[in-house]
C-alpha cells in the first residue's frame, strides 16, 4: 500500500507542478485587468453553503469589445474598434442558476448617439443655403464634439451682425448636455477661426482703428450714418423775434377799420410805416457731424458694457441735437419756418462753459458708445448676445417681452482646456445647462441684439459661438425615450455556456433592467447560464448610433449562488440508479428461482421442486438410518433437525417471496445505510422514509471542491503568495486529490458491498437448503459470514472516514478560509533601479500581473503568509483517509473470520483502474511509466556497457603503446 501511495503522490506532485506552470502562463494573460470580481468567504446572510460573488464588468456604449490595429500615415499603429463588431452582447462571466437572485448597480455615463449641426444654424439658414444649411461643402453632416471630449476643440459658428434673427445652435433632447462658448474679442491682432463648412481656416485683421470688422473679430456695431459730435454757435443764422417796423408819422397814426388798423394819414410823408413786420438776425447752435460708428479702440472708450437691460445697450443718436429744430434749415424769411432754435443738447454735447465757436467738451464725448464686444468690456458676458429655447427651431426676428442675455458661467465651471498655456481664454463658456424638460425636443437659439426697426444690413462685425454637445446622454443605467424608444436601458439575456449569442444566429428575448436613481436594480434569473449584457440603442441605419456612441458603464454584480450539492447532483442519481438496478436484479433472481407468479414456467426453474426433493430425501434418509439403528438421536438433535426441516419447508410456501421482499430484503440491504447515517448525523430520506444516500457527510466538502467557485478561487489564490505560495498550492492540491481518490474508493467499496449483499440475498433459497446436510453445512455458514461481512464492511469503513472528513473540512477552512478578489498580485519592477535611477523611483512597478489574491492583501506591503502547520495537518489527514480504507477492510476480515475477496479490495481495484484510465490520457498511467522507466533503464545499461567497452579498449591501447615503447627502448 505504501509503495502504491508513494507512486500516486509522485504522480500528483508532477501534475500539480504542471498545473503551476500552466497557471503561471495564465498569469501573464492575467496582466491584463479583466475586472475586480470578488468571491466572498460567506454570503451576506452568513450562510457558508453559498458562494457570495461580486464582480464588476465594463459595458461599452458602442457594444464593441474587439480592437484591431490600424496603420497611421506616419507609420505608427493605433488600436481601433473592429468595424464589424458593433452592437454585440458582452459575456459578464457571471454564472447563475434559474431563479437565482442577482443584485447590481450601474455606474457611469454614456452618450448613445452623436450630435450634428442643426439646420437654420447661426451661420446658414435654409434661405441662404437651401437644403444644405447643415451640410459642409462636401455634402456631409457636421458632427459636434462631445462635452467630455477634452482633446477635441468645439466647432465654431460665425454670427454675422447683419443677421438680426433667431438661429439654431443645437438640437436638444431630454438629458442632453451642451456647452456653448464665445470666442474672445480679438484686439490688436488677427483672428483665426475654423470654418467647419469649408474645412479651412479663416484669418482676418482685427486690429483697432477700424469702423468695420469681420464677424470673427468678436465685436459688432449696429450704428451707421451720421451723428452729432460738436455744436457751433452760428451768428445771424436765422430770422426771428418778429416785430413791427417803427412808425414816423408826424401827427401820429390813425385807426381805420377797413384797412390796416394803424396807418398814417395822407398828410404824412411815410405811408404805411406802421404796418411792416421785421425780424432780428439771431444766432443758433448748429450740429457738427461725424460718421458712425467711430473707429474701434481697444481701450473700450467706444464700447458698451454688458447689461441685461436693452435700454442700457442703445443710444438714440438721432435724438441728440445741439438746438431745437436744428435739422430744419432756415429759409431766410421773416419770420423763419420755425420759431424755436433754442439750445437743446448743446451743454451735453459741447459743454456748459463753451459759449462760442465749436464746442465739443460736453459729457457726451465721454459717453459715446458704438461697439458691443464678446468680452463684455470686462462684464458678466458677451454684450448684446441673447438666447432662447424654441420648440420647432424656426427662424424669426420677433423679440420676446423678456430677453435672456448670455452670461459667462462661474470661473469654477470653465473647462481648463479652454485656456491657452498663458491662462488666456480661447473660448469662454456662456451656457452649460443640461436640457431637462417635459418637451421631447427643443432648439437652443441665439441672436445679436439690435432694434427690430433698424436695418440690420448696415451692421458690422459679429461674434463666433462655439458648441460642444453630448447627445443621448444617459447615466447610471437610466433610460427614456428620445427619437428611439427606451434608449439607454441595460438589457440582459441568459445563455448556456456553450452558446455565443453574437454568432449563434438564434433570436433571444432580452430583459430590460429597471434601475433607481442610483443605478441599483435586482432581478431573478429566468433560466440557468451566463449573463450577457448590452446597452439598448437604435440598431437601424447600419448600427450608426452604436458606432457613434461613447462612454461605458461599470456594472457591479453581487449575487449569492447556492453551491451545487454533491449529494443531490452526483451521489443521489448514481446510487439511486445503481441500487435500483441491483435490487431489481436480486429480486429477479429470487423470483426466477421460485417462479413467483409466473404464468409461463419455461422462462424459470421452480426451485421449490428441488427443495421438496431434498427435504423428502433428507427425511427418508434420516428415518431409515434411525430405524436401522445407524443414527442415534437425542432431544437436542431432534429439535435442531425439526427446526431445519421447518425452515427449509417454509421455502416451499408460495408467500416466500413476499416475506423476503417485505421484511428481510430491505432490512438487510439498508442495514449499512441506516448505521452510517446515524453515525454521521446526516441522513437523506425519500418519500417512503427510507435512507437513499448514506454519503451525506461528504456533501459539504465535496460540494465545495467540485462546485464552489469561491473554493477554486481560494485555491488559485495560493499562487499569489510568492514562491512559498507555489509550495502551499502543490501540497494543498495533493491533499485534495488524495481526499477525492479516497472518496471514490469509499464509494466503490460501498457499491461493491451493496451489490454483493443483494446478490447473496437473491440466492438465499439455494444456500438455506444447504443447511440440511452436514457435508453442505459449510456452504451455508460461509454464505452467512460473507453476508454479514458485506453488511458490516461499509459501516466500519465509513465510521473512520466520517471522523477524518470532518477534520479535513476544518483544517481546509483554516488553510483557505478567506475571501478572494481578482487584483494586482505580482508587480514587475526594474531590477537594480537604485544604482541607475534616483531613489524616488524605487519600488515603482512597471506593470502588474493580476490574479486571484486573498482579500486585503496588498502587494506593496508584502505577501501574506499561511500557517504551515495547518497545511501539514491537512496532508496527514488526507493520507490517513487513504490508508484507512484498506485498513478497515482488514479489520472486518478479522472480525467476521471470512476469508476471501473483500469489497475493499474490489473497490480499490476499481478506483485504481479508473485512475489509470484517466492518467493514460496524459501518459502517466502505470504501464506507460513502466515503459518509460524500462526504456530509460535499458538506455542506461547500454550506456554503461558502452563505457565499459570504451574503457577496456583504452586499457588495451595504453598497454599496446607501453609494449611498443619498451621494445624501442631495448633496441
From Swiss-Prot:
Keywords on record: Cell membrane, Membrane, Signal, Transmembrane, Transmembrane helix
UniProt record, GO biological process: protein secretion by the type IV secretion system
Subcellular location: Cell membrane
Location of the region described as Disordered in the Swiss-Prot/TrEMBL record: 127-146, 933-971
Main location: membrane
TM helices/strands, residue ranges: 611-631, 721-741, 753-773, 795-815, 832-852, 865-885
Biased composition (Basic and acidic residues): 938-954
The keyword Flavoprotein belongs to this UniProt entry's keyword annotation: no
Entry membrane topology: Multi-pass membrane protein
Residues in the signal sequence: 1-24
One term under GO cellular component: plasma membrane
Keyword Ribosomal protein carried by entry: no
Pfam families found in the cross-reference section: TrbL
Family to which this protein belongs: Belongs to the TrbL/VirB6 family.
Name assigned to this protein: Uncharacterized protein RP106
Protein source organism: Rickettsia prowazekii (strain Madrid E)
Amino acid at each position: 500500500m505504501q509503495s502504491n501511495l508513494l507512486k500516486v503522490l509522485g504522480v500528483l506532485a508532477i501534475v500539480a507542478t504542471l498545473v503551476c506552470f500552466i497557471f503561471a502562463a495564465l498569469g501573464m494573460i492575467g496582466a491584463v485587468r479583466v475586472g475586480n470580481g470578488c468571491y466572498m468567504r460567506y454570503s451576506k446572510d452568513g450562510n457558508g453553503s453559498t458562494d457570495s460573488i461580486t464582480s464588476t464588468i465594463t459595458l461599452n456604449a458602442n457594444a464593441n469589445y474587439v480592437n484591431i490595429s490600424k496603420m497611421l500615415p506616419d507609420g505608427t499603429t493605433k488600436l481601433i474598434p473592429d468595424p464589424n463588431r458593433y452592437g454585440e452582447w458582452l459575456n459578464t462571466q457571471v454564472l447563475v442558476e434559474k431563479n437565482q437572485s442577482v443584485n447590481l448597480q450601474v455606474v457611469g455615463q454614456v452618450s448613445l448617439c452623436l450630435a450634428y449641426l442643426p439646420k437654420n444654424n447661426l451661420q446658414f439658414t435654409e434661405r441662404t443655403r437651401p437644403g444644405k444649411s447643415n451640410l459642409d461643402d462636401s455634402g456631409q453632416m457636421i458632427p459636434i464634439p462631445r462635452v467630455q471630449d477634452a482633446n477635441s476643440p468645439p466647432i465654431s459658428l460665425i454670427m454675422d451682425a447683419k443677421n438680426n434673427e433667431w438661429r439654431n445652435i443645437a438640437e436638444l433632447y431630454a438629458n442632453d448636455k451642451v456647452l456653448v462658448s464665445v470666442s474672445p474679442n480679438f484686439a490688436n491682432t488677427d483672428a483665426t477661426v475654423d470654418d467647419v463648412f469649408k474645412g479651412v481656416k479663416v484669418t482676418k485683421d482685427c486690429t483697432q482703428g477700424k469702423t468695420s470688422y469681420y464677424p470673427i473679430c468678436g465685436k459688432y456695431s449696429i450704428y451707421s450714418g451720421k451723428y452729432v459730435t460738436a455744436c457751433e454757435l452760428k451768428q445771424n443764422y436765422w430770422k426771428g423775434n418778429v416785430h413791427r417796423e417803427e412808425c414816423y408819422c408826424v401827427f401820429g397814426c390813425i385807426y381805420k377799420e377797413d384797412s390796416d388798423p394803424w396807418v398814417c394819414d395822407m398828410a404824412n410823408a411815410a405811408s404805411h410805416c406802421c404796418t411792416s413786420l421785421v425780424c432780428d438776425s439771431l444766432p443758433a447752435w448748429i450740429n457738427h457731424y461725424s460718421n458712425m460708428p467711430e473707429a474701434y479702440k481697444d481701450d473700450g472708450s467706444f464700447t458698451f458694457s454688458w447689461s441685461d437691460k436693452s435700454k442700457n445697450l442703445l443710444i438714440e443718436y438721432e435724438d441728440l441735437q445741439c438746438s431745437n429744430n436744428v435739422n430744419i434749415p432756415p429759409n431766410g424769411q421773416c419770420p423763419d419756418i420755425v420759431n424755436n432754435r433754442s439750445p437743446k443738447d448743446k451743454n451735453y454735447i459741447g459743454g456748459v462753459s463753451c459759449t462760442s465757436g465749436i464746442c465739443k467738451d460736453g459729457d457726451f464725448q465721454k459717453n459715446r458708445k458704438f461697439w458691443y464686444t464678446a468680452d463684455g468690456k470686462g462684464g458678466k458676458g458677451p454684450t448684446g448676445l441673447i438666447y432662447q429655447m424654441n420648440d420647432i427651431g424656426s427662424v424669426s426676428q420677433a423679440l420676446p417681452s423678456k430677453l435672456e442675455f448670455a452670461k459667462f458661467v462661474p470661473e469654477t465651471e470653465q473647462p481648463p482646456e479652454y485656456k491657452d498655456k498663458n491662462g488666456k481664454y480661447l473660448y469662454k463658456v456662456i451656457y452649460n445647462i443640461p436640457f431637462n424638460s417635459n418637451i421631447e425636443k427643443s432648439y437652443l437659439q441665439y441672436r445679436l441684439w439690435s432694434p427690430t426697426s433698424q436695418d440690420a444690413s448696415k451692421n458690422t462685425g459679429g461674434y463666433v459661438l462655439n458648441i460642444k454637445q453630448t447627445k443621448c446622454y444617459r447615466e447610471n443605467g437610466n433610460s427614456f425615450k428620445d427619437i428611439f424608444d427606451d434608449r439607454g436601458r441595460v438589457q440582459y439575456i441568459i445563455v448556456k455556456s456553450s452558446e455565443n449569442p453574437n454568432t449563434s444566429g438564434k433570436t433571444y428575448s432580452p430583459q430590460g433592467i429597471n434601475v433607481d436613481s442610483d443605478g441599483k436594480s435586482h432581478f431573478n434569473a429566468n433560466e440557468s447560464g451566463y449573463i450577457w449584457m448590452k446597452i439598448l440603442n437604435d440598431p437601424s441605419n447600419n448600427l450608426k448610433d452604436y458606432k457613434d456612441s461613447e462612454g461605458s458603464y461599470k456594472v457591479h454584480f453581487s449575487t449569492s449562488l447556492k453551491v451545487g450539492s454533491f449529494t443531490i447532483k452526483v451521489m443521489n442519481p448514481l446510487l439511486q440508479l445503481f441500487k435500483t438496478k441491483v435490487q431489481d436484479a436480486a429480486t429477479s433472481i429470487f423470483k426466477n428461482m421460485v417462479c413467483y407468479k409466473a404464468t409461463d414456467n419455461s422462462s424459470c426453474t421452480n426451485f421449490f421442486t428441488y427443495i421438496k426433493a431434498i427435504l423428502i430425501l433428507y427425511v427418508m434418509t434420516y428415518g431409515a438410518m434411525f430405524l436401522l439403528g445407524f443414527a442415534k438421536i437425542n432431544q437436542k438433535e431432534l429439535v435442531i433437525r425439526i427446526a431445519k426441516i421447518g425452515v427449509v419447508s417454509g421455502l416451499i410456501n408460495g408467500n416466500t417471496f413476499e416475506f423476503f421482499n417485505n421484511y428481510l430484503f430491505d432490512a438487510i440491504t439498508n442495514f449499512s445505510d441506516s448505521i452510517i447515517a446515524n453515525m454521521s448525523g446526516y441522513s437523506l430520506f425519500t418519500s417512503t422514509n427510507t435512507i437513499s444516500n448514506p454519503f451525506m457527510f461528504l456533501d459539504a466538502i465535496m460540494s465545495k471542491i467540485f462546485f464552489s467557485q469561491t473554493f477554486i478561487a481560494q485555491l488559485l489564490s495560493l499562487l499569489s503568495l510568492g514562491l512559498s505560495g507555489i509550495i502551499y498550492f502543490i501540497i494543498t492540491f495533493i491533499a485534495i486529490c488524495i481526499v477525492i481518490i479516497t472518496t471514490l474508493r469509499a464509494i466503490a467499496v460501498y457499491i461493491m458491498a451493496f451489490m454483493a449483499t443483494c446478490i447473496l440475498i437473491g440466492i438465499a433459497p439455494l444456500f438455506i437448503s444447504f443447511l440440511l446436510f452436514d457435508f453442505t453445512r459449510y456452504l451455508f455458514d460461509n454464505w452467512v459470514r460473507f453476508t454479514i461481512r458485506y453488511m458490516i464492511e461499509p459501516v466500519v469503513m465509513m465510521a473512520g472516514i466520517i471522523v477524518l472528513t470532518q477534520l479535513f473540512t476544518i483544517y481546509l477552512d483554516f488553510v483557505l478560509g478567506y475571501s478572494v478578489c481578482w487584483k494586482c498580485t505580482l508587480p514587475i519592477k526594474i531590477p537594480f533601479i537604485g544604482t541607475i535611477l534616483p531613489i524616488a523611483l524605487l519600488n515603482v512597478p512597471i506593470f502588474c500581473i493580476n490574479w486571484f489574491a486573498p482579500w486585503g492583501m496588498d502587494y506593496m506591503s508584502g505577501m501574506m503568509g499561511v500557517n504551515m502547520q495547518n497545511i501539514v495537518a491537512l496532508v496527514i489527514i488526507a493520507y490517513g483517509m487513504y490508508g484507512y480504507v484498506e485498513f478497515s477492510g482488514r479489520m472486518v476480515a478479522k472480525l467476521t473470520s471470512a476469508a476471501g475477496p473483500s469489497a475493499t479490495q474490489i473497490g480499490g481495484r476499481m478506483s485504481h483502474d479508473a485512475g489509470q484510465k484517466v492518467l493514460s490520457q496524459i501518459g502517466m498511467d502505470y504501464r506507460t511509466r513502466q515503459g518509460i522507466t524500462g526504456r530509460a533503464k535499458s538506455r542506461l545499461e547500454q550506456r554503461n556497457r558502452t563505457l565499459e567497452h570504451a574503457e577496456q579498449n583504452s586499457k588495451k591501447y595504453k598497454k599496446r603503446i607501453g609494449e611498443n615503447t619498451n621494445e624501442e627502448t631495448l633496441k
